[in-house]
């Protein structure tokens, strides 16, 4: 009987030989400079660990909650023991507000770019139940909620791309993970989600989330990629690493 590692190697070879490299990458613009970017608020239940910058606009710094912020001497950014990088908000000193306005605009543009791509390679595949599945490069589209109650694999090379268009909600069950195989990289995986996103306790998520609404990472969960939300991001002792 073949091992799972051997089978994944065979699938990786098939992907590189048969499937296209995936859709054209989504241009994030200056929104890509942030591990977390949101419009309405970013909250944490300490201790969370964020590697990268956190930006908030048009909401003010009072909506950066749970971080115990320390303002810089310039008044243009703050720091937190939970964040490796700067935190900025719309009411900070010049030029921060204009930088954030541009980033928020770029986030909206990226969302539209990803959400309106046509001609999906995979339409309503697995009816949105991704647990146990293997996903090659391509453009995926669902008009319903998408979730995983078991681990699943995203497989492809380091230059391949994925766009997952989701009209409903997105969820990853507690303790489950997305496995990257064949060299696939989180920075090349885009989840464009119209509904709420919930990464349950202890789950491990991979990719860039472009969210129309709220994103929640529950206790002990982690994300490699970025969270770009048009409303709010809530972390509960979670880890976010910008990729």
Swiss-Prot record:
Chief place of localization: secreted
A Pfam family recorded for this sequence: Ice_binding
Noted pH dependence of activity: Optimum pH is 5.8.
Signal peptide: 1-20
Induction remark: By low temperatures, 0 degrees Celsius.
Effect in UniProt of substituting residue 198 to N: Has 63% thermal hysteresis (TH) activity of that of the wild-type
Effect seen on changing residue 172 to V: Has 66% thermal hysteresis (TH) activity of that of the wild-type
Marked site (Ice-binding) residue numbers: 40, 232
Family from the record: Belongs to the ice-binding protein family.
Name of this chain's protein: Ice-binding protein K1-A
Protein species of origin: Typhula ishikariensis
């Amino acid at each position: 009987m073949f091992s799972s590692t051997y089978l994944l190697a065979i699938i990786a070879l098939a992907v590189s030989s048969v499937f296209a490299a995936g859709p054209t990458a989504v241009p994030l613009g200056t929104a890509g400079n942030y591990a977390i970017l949101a419009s309405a608020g970013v909250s944490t239940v300490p201790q969370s660990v964020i590697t990268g910058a956190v930006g908030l606009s048009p909401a003010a710094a009072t909506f950066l909650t749970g971080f115990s912020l320390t303002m810089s001497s310039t008044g243009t950014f703050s720091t937190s023991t939970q964040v490796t990088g700067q935190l900025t908000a719309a009411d900070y000193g010049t030029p921060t507000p204009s930088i954030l306005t541009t980033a928020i605009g770029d986030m909206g543009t990226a969302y539209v770019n990803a959400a309106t791509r046509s001609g999906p390679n995979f339409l309503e595949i697995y009816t949105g139940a991704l647990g146990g599945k293997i996903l090659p490069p391509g453009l995926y589209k669902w008009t319903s909620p998408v979730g995983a109650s078991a681990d699943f694999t995203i497989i492809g090379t380091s230059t391949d791309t994925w766009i997952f268009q989701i009209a409903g909600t997105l969820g990853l069950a507690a303790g489950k993970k997305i496995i990257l195989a064949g060299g696939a990289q989180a920075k090349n995986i885009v989840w464009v989600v119209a509904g709420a996103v919930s990464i349950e306790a202890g789950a491990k998520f991979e990719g860039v989330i472009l969210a129309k609404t709220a994103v929640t990472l529950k206790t002990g969960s982690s994300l490699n990629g970025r969270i770009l939300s048009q409303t709010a991001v809530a972390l509960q002792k979670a880890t976010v690493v910008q990729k």
